[in-house]
């Protein structure tokens, strides 16, 4: 048969070219290609020789075979599955997967869908962290154990990484070729089931995004999925399922949804017990049952934005890793190597009759052996509930360990602690303390904030200060106070400042400074709405839902939990009732400014009374204590005479303005004068403050 490429003239030209190249000194630097594939000079010479001894057709076949060899023996399509994924069933046989507890129902549903003749493609839908991937691993273990329908008892579950299908596909058609190889691999193996985690990524995956007609992964898979030629298990979240899969109705009907809900606290404890051995072996830390229960209980209470069992497992893992880092493991290999070296030294010492040296070496060997035995688990660290509390505190910033240890005593004494900081407002302090004790002791309904209060009274009597002290006492620092000045929320756009803008408006993607976002990041907070009477009526409408249901939906549709917050609103409205005003008089005044349904949502409406001079005596002591804290940084002590305190009270007393004028007098007459004295006497270590000629004077030592 005549061939225009492989004829005798071509063979002679090629042999002559090879002969010339073999005589060149630069052959080692040259590269040779056949059909675009690089071959070695030896293979090319062999092919040339074959071309001279055989027909043109045989020469062409030899060239093609060499190209295939150089391309690499990639083997069958089954090997391609191994290249792009993990065989979960094989890992289950090898005992590499964690046990799956409490998911029998979901595993059974998934197995039933897989055993169908057509459209046998389950998709696990659930929020992040509920254990969708673990269910697939549990199915792989069930296949190994034989606890599945006969139709899938021989299946191999291959976890496929979508990005590996796209890797290296810079040329048109390369991605489609990978998908075809994947499909052929599944068909040829006859027992492979593909698992795509985050399966919503298949929408548009591999498409060029242009009008050129390039197909994405989902478009290529649809025909094979509908005919049952391949079987796929998918996993995705509710939002991604709604926003991606459900929009493609042709793809949706090829999948069967398996809903995965968050496990209960009891089931999560059993899950932790099932995986405990793996964590103990990995970290060399003992994890008792009470620690596992604390992981679940504390993660539910203090990490509400995440779901079980993921958050409980994370707390357990972090705690064990922290304890393991504090007790570094002995390097077993190095220790055994050192023992072997010492054994040799001991034998040499005995041979040389150096018995004292041999005895010392034996003591060192025994010490290393004891150390090695201890590292094998006899003296491993044991986790405690307090360790779990410390982990929660590091994750959230909430002083959980402090509240855990002495919570009952702290609850009993909360009113005394607040009363020492908030002077002259015993009724307000007691009402707030009762609400907090009721919540922390577990005797409220649990579906509302810890407490919601309306503080009413004149300016400068401690309304804002009580909110600050609550944040410090309950949550450990004053940064837990979220303060909103309602004068900034009086316009019609106030709602967008609270919950963020909705879709279609500017700033939809940037809601970082809204109230809902602040509470999402710090769910344990005191929220202060200062001068609430100045707020837009729409703000008050939003607060109805917060105080009644304990949650609020932001502009992007996320439900924010307010159940661990304290809501405090302050107002100057109706403060003129005087010290002997009754509750009905307060309510009568409040109804002039607020709707009845708003007032009825509060746990308590608290009137703050005018401060008298006796109350200012305690307040001036607190203000002077703050001055002393500042002086401590300079190593200076301070004594203030009673006459000086009386003078400050007399100068700073104003019944209408409360304690703020007194704070201003202390700043001007005490802080400023101490500053002036310090600048003239930088070596001063002690100052005395007294009154002379109706003037405050500072003297130093």
From Swiss-Prot:
Task: Please list the residue ranges that the record marks as compositionally biased, kind Low complexity.
Answer: 58-72
Region called II, residue ranges: 383-575
Give me the residues that bind ATP, please: 126-133, 457-464
The entry's keywords: ATP-binding, Chaperone, Nucleotide-binding
**Which stretches are tagged as biased composition: Polar residues?**
47-57
Question: Per the UniProt entry, what are the Gene Ontology biological process annotations, in alphabetical order?
Answer: cellular response to heat
| Molecular functions (GO terms) | ATP binding; ATP hydrolysis activity
| Cross-referenced InterPro entries | AAA+_ATPase, ATPase_AAA_core, Clp_ATPase_C, ClpA/B, ClpA/ClpB_AAA_lid, ClpA_ClpB, P-loop_NTPase
For this protein, the record's PANTHER family field holds:
ATP-DEPENDENT CLP PROTEASE, ATP-DEPENDENT CLP PROTEASE ATP-BINDING SUBUNIT CLPL
Q: What does this protein do?
A: Required for the development of induced thermotolerance.
Stated name of the protein: ATP-dependent Clp protease ATP-binding subunit ClpL
